[in-house]
A protein has these predicted regions:
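DNA major-groove recognition helix of helix-turn-helix/homeodomain DNA-binding modules
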Residues: 48-65
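Recognition helix of helix-turn-helix/homeodomain-like DNA-binding domains
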Residues: 31-44
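N-terminal flexible/basic segments that precede or flank functional cores
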Residues: 1-2, 43, 52-55
Length: 65
């Protein structure tokens, strides 16, 4: 399966901001395994890009305040 470009960009941003799959999963209310499946392109749920980006943005904002 080919990973979407957005997942690569998001993984890079998460790495730069030191955000883990576990932290993202907690923010989204899902398991870290599910986060991994989506980011690795094994799952492509509707609206995932928007939900995942919003959660990462929120985690970044929370750290800066």
């Amino acid at each position: 399966m080919l990973s979407k470009e957005w997942t690569g960009n998001l993984v890079g941003l998460m790495h730069n901001e030191k955000i883990t799959n576990i932290q993202l999963a907690e923010k989204l209310g899902v398991t870290d395994r599910y986060v991994s499946m989506v980011l690795n392109g094994h799952r492509e749920p509707d609206g995932a890009e928007q939900r995942f980006r919003a959660a990462v943005d929120e985690l970044i904002r929370e750290r800066k305040t």
